[in-house]
Design a protein with these regions (language model features):
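Acidic/His- and Gly-rich active-site-bordering loop/insert found
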Residues: 2-124, 143-150, 327
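Generic secondary-structure signature for well-ordered alpha-helical cores
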Residues: 28, 55, 143-146, 175-176, ...
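An extended, acidic, His-containing surface patch that forms the Zn2+-binding/catalytic region
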Residues: 59, 82-84, 192-193, 248-314, ...
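Alpha-helical metal-binding/catalytic segments enriched in His/Glu/Asp
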Residues: 89, 113-163, 208-212, 224-246, ...
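Acidic, glycine-rich active-site loops and adjacent beta-strand->loop/helix elements
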Residues: 93-95, 118, 155-164, 186-190, ...
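Acidic/histidine-rich catalytic neighborhood of metal-dependent amide-processing enzymes
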Residues: 123-201, 459-462
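Flexible glycine/proline-rich, aromatic-decorated loop/lid segments
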Residues: 197-213, 417-422
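A short glycine-threonine-serine/GTX helix/turn-capping micro-motif
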Residues: 219-228, 313-316
């Protein structure tokens, strides 16, 4: 009974095909939460797949529902000693739409396909592959020790890809059931494929629409050009006053007052790397005076996700009556999400664009969160991962993307430590989503070591 035995068990689970078999079965389940017809599949992932898996590990399981949720929730718990440390785990079994016609020839979103150093399939990276690693690591520790040495609770939701509707309410209504000492979970990418990573929160995400509706229909550009406004041109200028030509945000309330010293220290040795097939980082893009890692992990960013005016598929010589854009602000701690649209309204009005209508494009907002990089649980996890790999992991104060971490940190009051098992070029929301088996195997080793250390040492002292 040793740490090395637990890690060897995790390696064997991978090497003998257990992990691949489990993930293949889970990828084949078409759990598209953005598809209203997939309700039965969302439920079956929990009742037919997760419940039997966790019950074999000694967990008691219950299914929870909420009227706002796209699918059910599973809460599983294994209580070994009420006085022991309790670790809260999280994952989501839903995926985005499969986008079947867009996948490369020979691939399918609903089949795990091995091709070279990649395993393809929807959910391999986000998030079936990741929570499968953590559950496999729990099993490896149980096999080695006969117990975990701590209490474990695991929440799996089926609506994360639609903004986790109902998750906040379920957590608020079940605080006693969900009570724990720390959240340890996995989602998102590492800093790079080669470097194990911890992140301690996430940027917030707010999606909204800009629209100009000038008149009922289009008018001939020869007869009316120079006489009536062009909404497409006006909206382009409105967007240009929101962010400069290199992406620098011009709405003061959308950026933090400062980059905290502890965040800057944590990011000092973090080099952003998208891998050989990722896009080239453009050094002049974004907030001036910040490093690439500070721009994506320490600052806000504004994006235009879609833009429409006229008839792009069949342009005609007419001044369009309308223009529309779907935009997004990724924001960090220090930006008030309730002030995002009011601040933009004031900004556009000051710059002469009162005709631009604003509307949030989805009800749910992912709020920004960030655990102090020098928190005792962070130091504990860093030491554990370093012990397993003999190398210091990257520590990101928050993920560049967004996830419902604020529910765990603010509603449940948990310190949050995430250990991602994907990498930046995994195509997680695109065709050809994949996981790197080398990272999956290392992830099993890392998590088995981390769970072993928690069972051996308990919660770190403040």
């Amino acid at each position: 009974m040793s740490r090395e035995t637990a890690i060897a068990n995790a390696e064997r689970y991978f090497d003998e095909g257990g992990y691949k078999a489990d993930l293949s079965r889970r990828v084949a389940m078409k759990t598209e939460s953005q598809n209203p017809d997939r309700g039965p599949e969302l439920a079956e992932y929990l009742t037919g797949e997760m419940v039997p898996t966790l019950e074999k590990l000694g967990f008691t399981c219950r299914i929870l529902h909420h009227p706002r949720a796209k699918g059910p929730f599973l809460i599983a718990e294994r209580i070994e000693d009420p006085k022991a440390t309790t670790v809260f785990g999280y994952g989501h079994g839903d995926v985005i739409r499969g986008l079947e016609p867009q996948w490369r020839e020979g691939l399918s979103p609903w089949a795990l396909v091995e091709d070279g150093e990649r395993w393809y399939g929807r959910g391999t990276a986000d998030n079936k592959g990741q929570h499968s690693i953590n559950i496999g690591a729990l099993a490896a520790v149980l096999k080695a020790r006969g117990k975990l040495g701590f209490n474990a609770k695991y929440l799996i939701e089926m609506g994360e890809e639609t903004g986790s509707p109902g998750l906040r309410e379920v957590c608020e209504a079940n605080k006693a059931l969900f009570k724990a000492d720390v959240l340890i979970a996995s989602d998102g990418p590492r800093l790079s494929a080669e470097r194990p990573t911890l992140f301690l929160g996430s940027r917030g995400a707010f999606n909204f629409d800009l629209e100009i509706d000038a008149r009922p229909g289009g008018h001939h550009s020869g007869n009316w050009g120079g006489l009536i406004s062009n909404p497409g041109l006006q909206l382009a200028h409105a967007i240009a006053c929101i962010a400069g030509p290199t992406g620098q945000i011009r709405v003061p309330e959308w950026v933090p007052a400062e980059l905290p010293a502890s965040v800057r220290r944590a990011l000092a040795d973090c080099e952003v790397d998208g891998g050989s097939d990722g896009p080239q980082i453009e050094p002049e893009w974004g907030e001036p005076g910040l490093t690439p890692s500070e721009r994506v992990f320490g600052w806000s960013s504004f994006e235009v996700l879609a833009y429409r005016t006229g008839n792009p598929d069949n342009p005609v010589n007419a001044i369009p009556p309308k223009a529309w854009a779907r935009c997004q602000l990724r924001f960090v701690v220090g930006v008030d999400p309730a002030n995002i649209l009011p601040a933009l309204r004031r900004h556009l009005d000051r710059h002469g664009f009162p005709m631009v209508k604003l509307a949030a494009s989805r009800e749910e907002i992912f709020h920004a969160t960030r655990l102090d990089p020098e928190h005792p649980w962070v130091n504990f996890a860093v030491d554990s991962l370093k012990r397993t790999t003999n190398a210091k992991p990257a520590v990101l104060p928050n993920l560049g993307g967004s996830l419902p971490n604020d529910i765990f940190s603010d509603v449940l009051g948990l310190p949050t430590v995430w250990v991602p098992h994907s990498y930046p070029s995994c195509s997680q929301h695109a065709p050809n989503e994949h996981i790197l088996p080398a990272i999956a195997r290392e992830g099993l080793r890392l998590m088995a070591g981390l769970y072993w250390d928690i069972g051996e040492k308990g919660a770190p002292r403040s």
